[in-house]
Each structure stands twice: as structure tokens, then as C-alpha cells.
Amino acid sequence: RSLYRRGFQRETLLELMTQAFYQPNIKLLKSRYEKNCRLLRKYPYCFQQDFPAFEELPLRFYPYDDQRYIPFTAETETFGEPLDLRHPVISRNFFQNLDKPVLAADVYSQYELEFLRDNVRKSEWVGRENHVYLHYTDWEIFCAYLQVLNLRPLLEEEKLVFLIGDEISQYPIDFQARFGIDYSRYP
């Protein structure tokens, strides 16, 4: 990667790295992507449904070791910094305004997504709308990360609401008006 960044035989190095690290993992990455797309198509609080084909995703993830990936942007042919999606660090304060449901932008860490799932009580338990709103500014980048995230455990309790781009204007959603769910009846 270092030689590649410096421009040393970029084409040859990219081909070697792709053959050694990316191609052996394409089947797994594609399978995970397709599984996550299927889950989101059935999920009631993901309103975008136009998932790009796997081959059209703007990022490829080259496994770095068992836990980390190096993202590669195909358009610019550049490698990013290594990512550890399970690194146990919370990068921001998700609970700044407790008067409204949590709103977090561009969360791509599996660890942070699981943290939000585990630390925000269900709307039924608090008697008011208390979902976690995840705002993703770029649909294609969000879709690219579906290759490396595991959404199944995150979606089971239906706590998450995915807002893409301009859908942020829907925050917070009136669940009673839109879905016929009155959380004030629950506790």
C-alpha cells in the first residue's frame, strides 16, 4: 500500500493486491452485501430501496487481517486508512440532546452501531418515540459498507431508522401518524 501510494508500479501492485487480498474474499463480501440488502428491503424503517449492484459499489474492501479492512475507492484508485469496524471506541457523544430521539450521522462502525442498539431503550419501554435515527449523507457509500457490516443483529428490535440524504427532513418521524403506532400506550 505504501509503495502504491508513492506511485511505484501502481498498476502491477494493484493487480497483485487485488489477486492476493480482494479476489479471495469477493464471494464473502458479495454474500454479506446481498444479505444486508435483503434485510433492509424487508425492514420497515429503511425507505431507500434502490441498492446498486455489487459490482457498481464505489468502495472495495481489502481485508487487512481478520478484523480490519483497507477501503479502496475505485473511481480515484486510492486506498484509505485501515478500518477496524469492531474497534471498541465510541467516537462521539450520541446522547447530547435527550429531549429528542438519537440522531447520528454516517456511523459505519459495527461497534458503535451495536452500542446504540444496546444503550437506547425501546420506544415501548419509555412510552414515547425513542428510535435511533441513522442519517447517511451518501447512499452509495452506505451501500458499500453493507459489504462489511452485519445488520442482522441490529435490525431485530426495529430500533433503528435509516434516513438517507434529504430524508433527514423527516426527523423525528411521527410514528402514530405515519405507522399507526402510539408509544404512549405502552409503559
List PLM regions with ranges.
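N-terminal donor/sugar-recognition subdomains of glycan-related enzymes
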Residues: S2-P187
